[in-house]
Amino acid sequence: MPIVSSAASIQRHPGIQDVAAPTELTSIPSVGEKLGSGSQKDVYHSRQDPRQCICLIRPDTTGIISGNEYAAKELKMTKHLKDLGFPVVDAYALVKYDNKVGIAKDYIHHALDSEDVIHNRKHIPTDMAFNKNVMKDCDEIISRLRTHSLHIEDLQFLIDGYGRVRINDPRDVIRSSPEKSIAKVRELRAIALNNLLDDSD
């Protein structure tokens, strides 16, 4: 049965359309296999829906705001970007398990984290079709950032097994110069382009 939480209001920025901040927490009885960990979240396969994963925020990793507020804002920003046509790792609901708050999101099988790729901790496949998809999606994201004049705080991506690039874990979306965000996209695009140039030699 859903548990209702009174998450605090989310700060608004000029020009950003007002998307209702979700505040309802759904208690889940269990989580599946652990898929990985980031700087703030532990990620598990969902037992409620095999197409989803559960991203639980670890305590004391969100600074001065609560885990509830942090998760609600990330869910809100993800939905806002999706409404603007950006490719995102879709997020569906706020959840609670084992006294931790989190988000139910799409489970991207065999996903690569863009930060791992950009910092040479992992390598994307050299397959031509894969890298063409990465470049196409990067170009689309750059175009939309320019069109909407957006800066995405802590911009990062997951790349699926076909080279499709999706924005993941957006911390904030601000109406501002997009150049810093575009530079981040170009880092990933350059790696895919280099793979294509190497393949053409």
Curated annotation (Swiss-Prot):
Enzyme class: transferase
Keywords of the record: ATP-binding, Kinase, Nucleotide-binding, Secreted, Transferase, Virulence
EC number: 2.7.1.-
Catalytic residues, chain numbering: D154
Subcellular location: Secreted; Host cell
Result of changing D169A: Loss of kinase activity. Does not induce severe disease symptoms in plants
One GO location term (cellular component): extracellular region
Residues noted as binding ATP in the record, renumbered to the chain: S39, Q40, K41, D106, I108, D113, Q156
Gene Ontology MF term list: ATP binding; kinase activity
Organism: Pseudomonas syringae pv. syringae (strain FF5)
Name of the protein in its database record: Type III effector protein HopBF1
Additional free-text comment from the UniProt record: HopBF1 is specific for eukaryotic HSP90, despite the fact that the target Ser is strictly conserved in prokaryotic homologs. This mechanism appears to have evolved to prevent phosphorylation and inactivation of the pathogen's own HSP90.
Domain notes: Adopts a minimal and atypical protein kinase fold.
Gene name linked to the record: hopBF1
Record's signal peptide: none
Catalytic activity: L-seryl-[protein] + ATP = O-phospho-L-seryl-[protein] + ADP + H(+)
Family statement: Belongs to the HopBF1 family.
